[in-house]
Amino acid sequence: MNSERTAEAIPHADPLSIFESWFAEARASEPNDPNAMALATATAEGVPSVRMVLLKGHGPDGFVFYTNLQSRKGGELAANHHVALLFHWKSLRRQIRIEGTIAKVTPAEADAYFASRHPESRLGSAASDQSRPLPDRQTYLDRVDALRAQYPDGNVPRPAHWSGYRVTPSAIEFWQDRDFRLHERRRFLADGQGGWTSTLLYP
């Protein structure tokens, strides 16, 4: 039997450690935005929506992203705390699926991240009524210009409607592309005691 064909590419290990290893490889391999991830949310009635966002922090306590709390996603997150994330790194032929629940980051965390952003990005976020109807693009640009005039030093304060969420994972699934679609999948489930159970899945 071909040992290379039967060897498992996804280790029996702490899934957060595997994520850290794969994410490091993605940062070295992906040409654009290796921290881009699909975020799936749903209404209280279960109507789903999905969009790309950027991972801005991760560790033992979860995965962090930031957004406008008054956007469509913000409304859905307020109504339904269950979410799913998906990373797809085409250059590595890998993907990671994460399921879990969200909680807001602390105001201090949100302030620190907002202050770290480029001044133009801060202006754009402060001026945007995200997901609401916009009569024309010039209206948005005029709002950005007005804020730029109000804060010529670029120190735009974080709007109250802009913050971040931390996803606490309950399930993490790793997928590795293999030849002839004989892919490899391993799913980890949180055991409720700080550990994980691991299962190899049919592709």
Curated annotation (Swiss-Prot):
In which pathway is this protein known to take part? Cofactor metabolism; pyridoxal 5'-phosphate salvage; pyridoxal 5'-phosphate from pyridoxamine 5'-phosphate: step 1/1; Cofactor metabolism; pyridoxal 5'-phosphate salvage; pyridoxal 5'-phosphate from pyridoxine 5'-phosphate: step 1/1
Domain of life of the native organism: Bacteria
A single GO BP term for this record reads: pyridoxine biosynthetic process
Q: What class of enzyme is it?
A: oxidoreductase
Enumerate the InterPro entries for this protein. Pyridox_Oxase, Pyridox_Oxase_CS, Pyridox_Oxase_N, Pyridoxamine_oxidase_dimer_C, Split_barrel_FMN-bd
| Entries under Gene3D superfamilies matching the protein | Electron Transport, Fmn-binding Protein, Chain A
UniProt KW rRNA-binding keyword: no
Q: Which cofactor does it need?
A: FMN
User: Where is FMN bound in this sequence?
Assistant: 51-56, 66-67, 72-73, 95, 130-131, 175, 185
For this chain, one GO molecular function annotation is: FMN binding
Listed PROSITE patterns: PYRIDOX_OXIDASE
**Catalytic activity of the protein:** pyridoxamine 5'-phosphate + O2 + H2O = pyridoxal 5'-phosphate + H2O2 + NH4(+); pyridoxine 5'-phosphate + O2 = pyridoxal 5'-phosphate + H2O2
Q: Name one Pfam family in it.
A: PNP_phzG_C
Q: What is its EC number?
A: 1.4.3.5
- The UniProt record gives the binding positions of substrate as 56, 113, 117, 121, 181-183
Which keywords annotate this record? Flavoprotein, FMN, Oxidoreductase, Pyridoxine biosynthesis
Subunit and interaction comment: Homodimer.
Briefly state the protein's biological role.
Catalyzes the oxidation of either pyridoxine 5'-phosphate (PNP) or pyridoxamine 5'-phosphate (PMP) into pyridoxal 5'-phosphate (PLP).
> What does the sequence similarity comment in the record state about its family?
Belongs to the pyridoxamine 5'-phosphate oxidase family.
- The identity of this protein, by name, is Pyridoxine/pyridoxamine 5'-phosphate oxidase
Identify the species of origin: Novosphingobium aromaticivorans (strain ATCC 700278 / DSM 12444 / CCUG 56034 / CIP 105152 / NBRC 16084 / F199)
Taxonomic lineage of this organism?
Answer: Bacteria, Pseudomonadati, Pseudomonadota, Alphaproteobacteria, Sphingomonadales
Whichever gene encodes this chain, its name is pdxH
